[in-house]
Amino acid sequence: MKKLFILFFTTILVQTCTYANNLEYINISFWQKFNDNILVDNLIKVYENNNDLKAAVLKTNEANRIVKMSFANELPHIGFEGYVGRIFKSSDEVFGNITIPNYAETHYYLPLSMNYEVDIWGKNHLITKSKKKQFEIVKQDERSAYIYITSAFAVDYFNLIRCDKLIDYQRQLITLQEQAINSYKIRYEYGTATLSEIDEAEKNLTYMKEDLHKLLEKQDMLKNQISTLLGDRAFKDISRSHYEDLNFSFTTPDSIDFNMLDKRPDRIKSELDLERIGIDVKVARRDLLPKFIITGNLGFNMYNLHSSHKFLADLGIVPVWDLFMGGRKLQMLKLK
């Protein structure tokens, strides 16, 4: 029970830390300048529920794990490769003047094996650096997703508020036009209005109703878009402020600092991608050089569990050089 509690607490803590780290992508302090708590609450819902943002976070976590896997290749690999087997009756074995008659025995081979590629050319370390650059690129993709989706939600949110107000105005215009038509009809009975005036007023009423229908369609479209961004199409209605309650407390700057362009995710991503390509070229070149692998075993090799001659230890270095692979490595270098 205690282990389950610790696991649950750790999971909640990790999720909270991830939420805190990614919340800055939404720039809540900026949106608070709109003095609209409903907008801020909806933006937090977008972060919690939007599927595209969840996918972006998962890709970032995946890229981070790939970096750790690449770093693991720089370290020695230690494993257990045991063997237990039985040699049954065999024919005589002759070694010069020595003859070993047929025999049967059981072998126990229980070593710890170690392999380590000596990174004398720095290739494995460069591969890890390349994966780190790719991780930074994916982080910029995640940042771009937060900026794009947050901005798209804010635009749809304020357009929906504006559309609500336009619908209200349009309904008021329709009511006034209907009153005007009734007035024309009364005047017509007294001979102070003509049928053409009534027809013109009714035609204008039809146009107004068509405009109202278009506004209602646009309102429905905006609601669907916002529901999609919120990550739940089951919302019956979208919480939003009234047009009269909007009160922006910030001013639009007259100019933008040119250095701000250097912080754009796409610009940072392009620079990181160029750096990654340069590293990959170095990796492809050093892949043409020989490798040196240190290998060793430490354990037991015996045919009798009670034998005193059972300790096994060996250590060696294996040079590996691919002399011919059909030109694959050269093509890989050109590809980079």
Residue ranges: model-predicted function:
Residues 22-35, 82-113, 236-253, 259, ...:
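Small/polar, glycine/serine/threonine/aspartate-rich low-complexity segments that form flexible
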Residues 4-13:
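Sec-dependent N-terminal signal peptides
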Residues 78-82, 270, 292-296:
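Membrane-embedded beta-strand positions of outer-membrane beta-barrel proteins
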Residues 54-58, 71-72, 118-146, 196-200, ...:
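Sec/SRP-type N-terminal targeting helices
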Residues 39-41, 55, 107-111, 155, ...:
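Transmembrane beta-barrel architecture of outer-membrane proteins
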Residues 18-68, 245-275, 322-323:
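Bacterial Sec-pathway N-terminal export signals of envelope proteins
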Residues 124, 133, 140-256:
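Periplasmic alpha-helical coiled-coil/stalk elements that build and connect Gram-negative outer-membrane
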